[in-house]
Amino acid sequence: MRVENNNVSGQNLDPEQIDLIDLLVQLWRGKMTIIISVIVAIVLAIGYLVVAKEKWTSTAIVTQPDVGQIAGYNNAINVIYGSAAPKVSEIQSILIGRFSTTFSALAETLDNQEEPEKLTIEPTVKNQSLPLAVSYVGQSPEAAQKQLAQYIQQVDDQVNDELEKDLKDNIALRMKNLQDSLKTQEVVAQEQKELRIRQIQEALQYANQAQVTKPQIQQTQDVTQDTMFLLGSDALESMVKHEASRPLVFSSTYYQTRQNLLDIESLKVDDLDIHAYRYVMKPTLPIRRDSPKKAITLILAVLLGGMVGAGIVLGRNALRNYNAK
């Protein structure tokens, strides 16, 4: 009874188990094909690793410039605009904004080249405008770090040149406005002087007609245009000569305008050293390569080679079985 049960048990093996064992047997018999396939895949992977361009990413973090970095620019703005000049914090925001815009434009230009270069700028913290992370992908760690530093400096120099040009244009416009204001005030002062002389001459004419030669009043501060002739012709003639030789009289606004003009003329824009950013972290020297990944590439090569080899073995055996039938 025990022998019969064993026979029955052996005859009732699971067909799926038999198929799996048969599959493993086929793969084992064709192991040389699989090994050769894996070796070929590894060789191809090594060839790819040798030929493929390496990618290394250097990153830097920048933020708005310090007050000391824009001291000269801030002083020039204050001289030009006076009380209407923007605050230091506003200037800092403007400068880093121009840096970001110019950097983005450069990144777009590099991306559209015949051989594109990957340069990026983005906030380091989501929903916060500052600080900014800038990065560059190069073919070696040193090249990526060096090129990123050069592009940052290039953008900073470009912003500096643009700001200096804007300052020169604003200075020229402001000087013209101040000069026009001075001319207007000088014309008004000259007209006031001429009016004063005509008034005295008219009073002198009345005094001569009334034959008033000596002052007829004691309190000169009470004299009006209608009563000026009472000062007498002698005094009025002296007043005419005095007013004619007297320099123009200007208000304090005139002298303040002139002082502003002199201050602006003394500005030396070319000597300003304007920086639109400040480093939070200088360009890094990358220690991990972005691509190609050696370990991952070789592992994938082994897996792919094994799969191809197994496919060849199973396909060949299936074709033999089909032909045998």
Curated annotation (Swiss-Prot):
Topological region Periplasmic: 53-294
Primary location group: membrane
Keyword Methyltransferase: no
Pathway: Bacterial outer membrane biogenesis; lipopolysaccharide biosynthesis
Gene3D superfamilies in the record: FepE-like
Record NCBIfam families: PRK15471.1
Name of the protein this chain belongs to: Chain length determinant protein
